[in-house]
């Protein structure tokens, strides 16, 4: 039974109350849904890339909702209650960061920047600091401290992993959720929809910016990422 449909995925119940099926759609959206398109095979590519990334992170001790891949478009995941926060890590200046602070794209930051936003389309996912999140009862201080440390750890793992594939991890967003025991674990997806990935040598963008900014065929970019991950 369909439980929820988001911009890029559908969530279905299973016979096990503690497990869901995630179905990856072909829909592409940008600018909080203002730009939309359906792009054939995008969902398949995101499912395959996310599967590889969740498996890679599991090898490094990062627990996520991922259980196993079921098909080209579907994965089985643990039931989690998603926290109403998106966490963002920036290694290189790009996107909204450049617009917000008036800096050039492509500056390598001295250290990663950790950001949080309130996961709410109605308000445009506004940025939050720790005090905002605590005051709005979106998370406790201890939970925010865990999110920060876990996200920065994930950043180091993914940076090294992508670098082996000649990809720069420019920035990315993650979502976390609480499992049935109340533990906070990584959720959602890890794909070129949620990560900015540039070629190390040419800085060619192989992520959703191809769609956002009309920089080339989106599927071609995602296929290139998957091909490198499968090497």
Feature map (PLM): residue ranges:
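Conserved metal-phosphate-binding beta-hairpin within the catalytic cores
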Residues: 89, 169-188
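Short coil-to-beta-strand
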Residues: 20-22, 120-131
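A short glycine-rich, hydrophobically flanked beta-strand micro-motif that places a catalytic Asp/Glu
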Residues: 68-73, 163-178
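Short histidine-centered catalytic/ligand-binding loop motif
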Residues: 34-44, 127-150
């Amino acid at each position: 039974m369909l439980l929820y449909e988001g911009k890029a995925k559908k969530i279905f119940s299973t016979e096990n109350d503690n497990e869901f099926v995630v179905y990856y759609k072909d829909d592409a959206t940008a600018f909080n849904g203002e730009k939309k398109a359906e792009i054939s095979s995008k969902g398949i590519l995101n499912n395959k890339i996310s599967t590889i990334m969740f498996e890679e992170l599991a090898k490094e001790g990062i627990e996520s909702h991922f259980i196993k891949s079921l098909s080209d478009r579907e994965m089985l995941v643990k039931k989690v209650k998603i926290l109403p926060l998106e966490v963002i890590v920036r290694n290189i200046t790009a996107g909204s960061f450049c617009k917000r602070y008036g800096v050039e794209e492509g500056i390598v930051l001295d250290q990663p920047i950790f950001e949080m936003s309130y996961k709410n389309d109605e308000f445009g996912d506004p940025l939050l600091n720790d005090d905002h999140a605590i005051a709005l009862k979106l998370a406790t201080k201890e939970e925010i401290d865990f999110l920060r440390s876990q996200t920065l750890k994930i950043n180091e793992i993914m940076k090294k992993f992508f670098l082996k594939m000649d990809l720069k991890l420019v920035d990315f967003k993650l979502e976390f959720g609480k499992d049935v025991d109340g533990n906070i674990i990584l959720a959602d997806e890890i794909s070129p929809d949620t990560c900015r990935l540039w070629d190390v040598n040419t800085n060619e963008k192989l992520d959703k910016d191809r769609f956002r900014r009309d920089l080339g065929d989106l599927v071609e970019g995602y296929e290139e990422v998957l091909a490198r991950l499968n090497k």
